[in-house]
From Swiss-Prot:
Binds 1 pyruvoyl group covalently per subunit. This is Phosphatidylserine decarboxylase proenzyme. Coiled coil: none annotated. Pathway: Phospholipid metabolism; phosphatidylethanolamine biosynthesis; phosphatidylethanolamine from CDP-diacylglycerol: step 2/2. InterPro entries: PS_Dcarbxylase, PSD-B, PSD_type1_pro. Is synthesized initially as an inactive proenzyme. Formation of the active enzyme involves a self-maturation process in which the active site pyruvoyl group is generated from an internal serine residue via an autocatalytic post-translational modification. Two non-identical subunits are generated from the proenzyme in this reaction, and the pyruvate is formed at the N-terminus of the alpha chain, which is derived from the carboxyl end of the proenzyme.
Length: 283
């Protein structure tokens, strides 16, 4: 790596700690939620152009018909665009995106990037709720700005708890994954816990800088607070059903207990996935 590239990386990481993360995200959130026709049309057009958004696969193909940027960003897809693997033993991708990391949880640690990991206990935010996942399996899926931003069930189960964990809002990308210790266990997140025929399963929705919000089917849009908030539920969700959505980012992490599933061998860091695609199978 050249001196210039290394310097840019170091400055980017330092800036993460200097920027008022939550205040910036709130400002972006207000713009994203605005239904002002001129503002929302301008923002949608700029975003669509920059990221090459393909509206031909969206349920609503006319960008002007969305009531706000948030409405556009969390757009539904046409029926049949994403097919959920119907094999009863399959574990499917919860979202469109790219695999950041995938594999085993070793000594309670989830691999983040070269030289970086974080504890499953810190990720979940509760030692007792995290216990079943020690030595289990994990997959981290990063949703880029151009991706479909709804998160779906990787396997059928009953939602029993949601746990809002307050935190920071670092940007999520390869640079921060490699240089911010415990990135995913430090950012604000919503932990969704399930009972399944395989035992316990978790889907963790992780926020990031300028993420305007996280929403789940059980809690609605999350209202950030400075404390951990645990809610109990009894909601049955089938594989492929919508679980939640991101307003501007960023990452979904799925966890299973030890010796319950196996990931397909072809998947590795940076593998591209689409929602409903078979990523693994039960044992």
């Amino acid at each position: 790596m050249s001196f210039t590239s290394r310097l840019k990386k170091e400055l980017f990481i330092k800036a993460q700690n200097l920027v008022p993360q939550h205040q910036l995200s709130r400002v972006v959130g207000k713009v994203a939620a605005s239904e002002n026709p001129i503002l929302k049309a301008a923002v949608i057009h700029a975003f669509k152009t920059k990221y090459g958004i393909d509206l031909s696969i969206a349920e609503q193909g006319n960008a002007l018909k969305y009531k706000s940027f948030n409405d556009f960003f969390t757009r539904a897809l046409k029926d049949g665009v994403r097919l959920v693997d119907e094999n009863p033993d399959s574990i499917v991708s919860p979202a469109d995106g790219a695999i950041s990391q995938i594999g085993k949880i070793t000594a309670g640690e989830v691999f983040q990037a070269k030289g970086q990991s974080f504890s499953v206990e810190k990720l979940i935010g509760d030692p007792q709720l995290a216990q079943p996942f020690q030595e289990g399996e994990f997959a981290t899926v990063y949703l880029s700005p151009r991706d479909y931003h709804r998160v779906h069930m990787p396997f059928s189960g009953t939602l029993t708890e949601t746990l809002y964990v307050p935190g920071e809002l670092f940007s999520v990308n390869q640079v921060t994954a490699e240089n911010v210790p415990g990135l995913f266990a430090r950012n604000e997140r919503m932990v969704c816990l399930f009972d399944t025929e395989l035992g316990r399963m978790a889907v963790v929705l992780v926020g990031a800088m300028i993420v305007a919000g996280i929403e789940t089917v059980a809690t609605g849009k999350v209202k950030p607070s400075g404390r951990i908030e645990l809610q109990h539920h009894e909601l049955k969700l089938e594989k492929g059903a919508e679980l939640g959505r991101f307003y501007l980012g960023s990452t979904a992490i799925i966890l299973f207990e030890k010796d319950k599933i196996e990931w397909e061998k072809r998947y590795k860091a940076e593998s591209v996935v689409v929602m409903g695609e078979r990523m693994g199978h039960t044992l």
